[in-house]
Structure formats: C-alpha cells, structure tokens
Amino acid sequence: MIKIGAHMPISGGFKRVPKETHEIGGNAFQIFPHNPRQWKAKLPKDDDVEIFKKRVKEYNLTEDSMLCHSGYLINIASPKEEIWQKSLELLILEMNICKTLGIRYLNIHPGSHLNSGVEKGINQIVKALNIAMEKEKETFILLENVTKKGGNIGSTLEELKMIIEMVKYPERIGITIDTCHAFDAGYDITNKEKLDKFLKMIDKLFSLEKLKFIHLNDSKNELGSNKDRHENIGKGKIGVKGLKTFLTNETIQKIPWILETPGDNEVHKNDIKEVFNILGVKQ
C-alpha cells in the first residue's frame, strides 16, 4: 500500500493532525514539533498528547508514516559557538517532543558551514548529533538532502555518508530524499536509468534500509539549478512525466511520501489526488 501525506499545520494543537491527515486523503504526515521560526519550544500538554495518540490509532497511522521536521533556525554545522549551542539545545528538545508524541523520526537539514568549510561543518554536525543522541536515546534522526546554496552541507549523497560514518550511533540515523532538492542539486530523477543509478548509489553508500521518507515535491527550477523552490505536483520542471518515472519505481513505492508543496490542506488534498492520477490509481 502506498503511504502518502503532507506537512500538516499544528496551530490548534497536535491533536488535530491525524484527523486532518485523513481528510486530505493521507495515511502519513509530517509536522513541526514547535513554531519553526522561533528558538522557543516546550513539551506538548498532556491532554493534547493523549488525544493525538488516540487519533493516531483511530486513523491507523503507523510509526513509519509519522515524521517531525526540525525548526528553521537550527544550524548544527555553524562555526559560531552561540548559534551551535542554541541549535544543539533546541534539537534535544525537539527529540524529546518527538518522544512525548510517540513519533520515532525527526528530519533535520544538516546545516550550513557559513564559509568555514565542509570538513569543519561536518565535524560540528557530528559533535552535535553525538551529544543529542546521548541525551535522548529513542528518536531516530533523518538527514535530508539539500541544495548547495548558502554553504549547505548535504547536497551530495557522499556528504550525508560522511556524517553517518562519523557519528557514534549510526544505527539511529537515516536519510530523507527530497525530490525538489535532488533535482535542483543535479540528480536527474526523471530519467529511469539515472533514477536506478541514483538508488543504487544510495544502496551502496548507506543501504536502502536507511531511506525512510521521501519529500515529494515538484521544482520551480531547472535540473541542477541549486535554487530549492518547491512547486505543486505536476506543475514544475520535474513535471507529470518525470514524476511518473519516479513514482512508479518499485523501491520508491515502498517508502512513505510526504508533500511539502505550496498551499494549505485543500491544496495538498488536490496534490494527493494528482499523485494518484499520475499513477493511474483510483482512490
């Protein structure tokens, strides 16, 4: 069975997420564990958690279909001590929020080295992850591929591999592949042969077992543009034909898909319908 959903709003509490996921035609979801544009965060209230967990069961949402996405301000690759420390503290709190909600996976962007160099940036990431995973021992961290702009680390699979090889607990780290980011970084996932090569590379570097989620987005920009601007399904440069190549791949169909396309729940509902239209599947 295909698992698909979208990034869902949490204003009004976590408790609303399972029901709204069902209403848009989803059986998977992603959420922020707090306001992503603030350093402030706190553990959710007991009643919110209780209703959330009850509805997770009610709507048959499984552990492998629920994902938290780290806040925008976190940069554990930063060479600036104050930012790195604040990022580490917030990351640990996010992991504890995940644990409280019963969500196993936390997706993070590796971060930007801010012109300090990839090697130093990776060392900072590894140091932070080692401390965080010592402090909170249940959450599974997913490193997301990104585009190269702004000193970002993780635009290549090899950079993600370096991080995983260096951490103390590699068994608690996996990856998320974002289709827009991959396409914009120069990986042609619209071509069957090149997609197969891309997946073989993932298997060789990490094993496909490490690939836990797909961020399913079209791209506003051309292959290799390094822009990172998401577009709605079938309306971008990946397009219907390219997405069909990607989505009909047997390996890809075994991994949950999370939409991060522009728009609200109603737009995401239509994007999910478009995904099934591309697949030729009736809902």
From Swiss-Prot:
For this UniProt record, the keywords arranged alphabetically read as follows: DNA damage, DNA repair, Endonuclease, Hydrolase, Metal-binding, Nuclease, Zinc
Q: Which domain of life is it from?
A: Bacteria
Cofactor details (free text): Binds 3 Zn(2+) ions.
Q: Which residues bind Zn(2+) 1?
A: 69, 109, 144
Instruction: Name the needed cofactors.
Output: Zn(2+)
Q: Does the keyword DNA damage apply?
A: yes
SUPFAM superfamilies to which the protein is assigned, alphabetical:
Xylose isomerase-like
Q: Which sites bind Zn(2+) 2?
A: 144, 178, 215, 260
Q: Which reaction does it catalyse?
A: Endonucleolytic cleavage to 5'-phosphooligonucleotide end-products
Would the keyword Electron transport be found if you checked this record's keyword annotation? no
Q: What is this enzyme's EC?
A: 3.1.21.2
Q: GO terms for biological process?
A: base-excision repair
Positions of Zn(2+) 3 binding:
181, 228, 230
Q: What class of enzyme is it?
A: hydrolase
InterPro entries, from UniProt? AP_endonuc_2, AP_endonuc_F2_Zn_BS, Xyl_isomerase-like_sf, Xyl_isomerase-like_TIM-brl
Q: Which Pfam families match?
A: AP_endonuc_2 (PF01261)
Q: Name one GO molecular function term.
A: deoxyribonuclease IV (phage-T4-induced) activity
Question: Of which family is this protein a member?
Answer: Belongs to the AP endonuclease 2 family.
> What does this chain do?
Endonuclease IV plays a role in DNA repair. It cleaves phosphodiester bonds at apurinic or apyrimidinic (AP) sites, generating a 3'-hydroxyl group and a 5'-terminal sugar phosphate.
Q: What is this protein called?
A: Probable endonuclease 4
> Could you tell me which species this protein originates from?
Thermosipho melanesiensis (strain DSM 12029 / CIP 104789 / BI429)
Tell me the name of the encoding gene.
nfo
